[in-house]
Amino acid sequence: MQATYIKVGREIDYTPSSAVSAGDVVVQVNLVGIATEDIAASALGSLAVSGIFDVDQNAEIIVAGDAVYWDADGNSVSGTAGAGAATATATDNTFMGYAQALTAATDSYVRVVLR
């Protein structure tokens, strides 16, 4: 046997060591997921690993179809500095998906198709 089908895979099980809020971006080595609900520390929850999400972004232009990366230390247009943001810069960041639409540098989010 080479493989056994488990499930569709839109979400994965996740048990955080500290509490996670709905909408938080979570990186597990090279896999980016987004919490769809609050998850208490040490409690089983799930992360979306596919779908389309509005993600806080760095102040930059991102073109539809561009690869989008998660910068864990990024400064979002409308969020807390250093709390993380989506970016088109690959260096030192984790691939999360592709931009669905053009994003202006002044937009607070980029619409991302998770991959």
What are these regions (language model features)?
Residues M1-R115:
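Surface-exposed, low-hydrophobicity beta-strand/loop segments enriched in small/polar/acidic residues
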